[in-house]
Amino acid sequence: MSDHRLTNIVKSLPASIPFVAPEEHERIVGKKFSARLGANENCYGPSPKVLEAIKNLSVDIWKYPDPTAHDLKKVLANFYNIPDNNIVIGEGIDALLGYLVRLFVQVGDNVVTSNGSYPTFNYHVEGFGGQLFKCDYLNDKEDLQSLIDTASKTKAKLVYISN
């Protein structure tokens, strides 16, 4: 494939796969996993109440949902006692992290995170032209002092702390 239409940022990125899906790992090892914990799934599946709610809502599945998620935001705002304009609804963590980076990181901006944090966050930073600085863990935990020091030294625009 010719890359003459790609942006310079995309052309400069190394070929990489930011996240290897559980299905790909299963193909590599030749068997299904009994628990896919890395995919944030539990081995019990959804509760019967969730299955019933999905079944009841499935009659309208053919309709596009409200793109503003108005009703969901109102329910969450009431539950957490915060303004609904403080809530962002997205189609998953990858997209939400992409929005975060897109909102705050311009070409050349410095961003600090830890080695081993969420892989697609790094992908978004590099994909939008940010400069990524990674800190090692300390005793299998985020090294907060290293993150703070690196952010200060690099004048980072954004610091991502994973949980």
Predicted features, each with a name:
Residues M1-K63, I161:
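N-terminal "arm"/small-domain region of PLP-dependent enzymes with the aminotransferase-like
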Residues W62-N163:
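Conserved core of the PLP fold type I
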